[in-house]
Design a protein with these regions (language model features):
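Active-site nucleophile elbow and catalytic-triad environment of alpha/beta-hydrolase enzymes
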Residues: 70-89
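Short alpha-helix in the alpha/beta-hydrolase fold that links the catalytic acid
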Residues: 95, 108-118
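Catalytic active-site module of serine/aspartate enzymes centered on a nucleophile-bearing elbow/loop
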Residues: 131, 135, 139-170
Length: 170
């Protein structure tokens, strides 16, 4: 079985870890992927409040939804912190990785993409000038065509898959 995966935002970090752990995964694309889970957690009183309530909410800046974050996620991370250290997995990953990042991402700064690129031995970095965290997409998407930045990211992903995945297996 040969698998190619794509991960966005926190899912970019998760998919990088999974690509490191799972030999079936042959190639990875991260879109606005995070480089570190630990520094995204609150500390001090905010951490204690989260623990006591079991959930905290953060507002999605695009949709204004209140997004739940359950304390169990933090506990799981702490119990498995070594496993969930993106930097370690990235530095030991021997698979092709495409890192796509927008320069106007309000949630994941482009510095994280540069770190991922530095850590991943077999990576390509693709920066999209002016692209935000969702590459111009929003929910609900009512248009016929993808936004230009997302279409650009999709085209680059297809190019990368053709070069690093499809030609090897078909």
């Amino acid at each position: 079985t040969k698998i190619a995966i794509i991960g966005h935002s926190r899912g970019g970090g998760i998919s990088l870890i999974k690509a490191y752990e799972d030999e079936r995964i042959r190639v990875l694309v991260t879109l606005a992927g995070v480089s570190n889970f630990n520094y995204r957690f609150p500390s001090g009183d905010r951490l204690e409040h989260w623990k006591n309530n079991g959930v905290m909410y953060s507002e999605n800046q695009r949709t204004h939804q209140q997004m739940p974050h359950y304390y169990q996620f933090y506990e799981d991370f702490k119990q498995n912190e070594e496993r969930f250290t993106i930097q370690y997995c990235a530095q030991h990953l021997e698979k092709p990785v495409l890192i796509i990042q927008g320069t106007e991402d309000e949630a994941v700064k482009d510095k994280e993409a540069f770190l991922l690129h530095e850590w991943c031995k077999k990576s390509e970095l693709y920066i999209i000038e002016g692209a935000n965290h969702t590459f111009g997409a929003k929910e609900p998407w009512m248009e016929q065509n993808l936004p230009a930045d997302l279409a650009n990211a999709v085209a680059e992903t297809i190019r990368f898959f053709k070069l690093n995945f499809l030609k090897k297996f078909f």
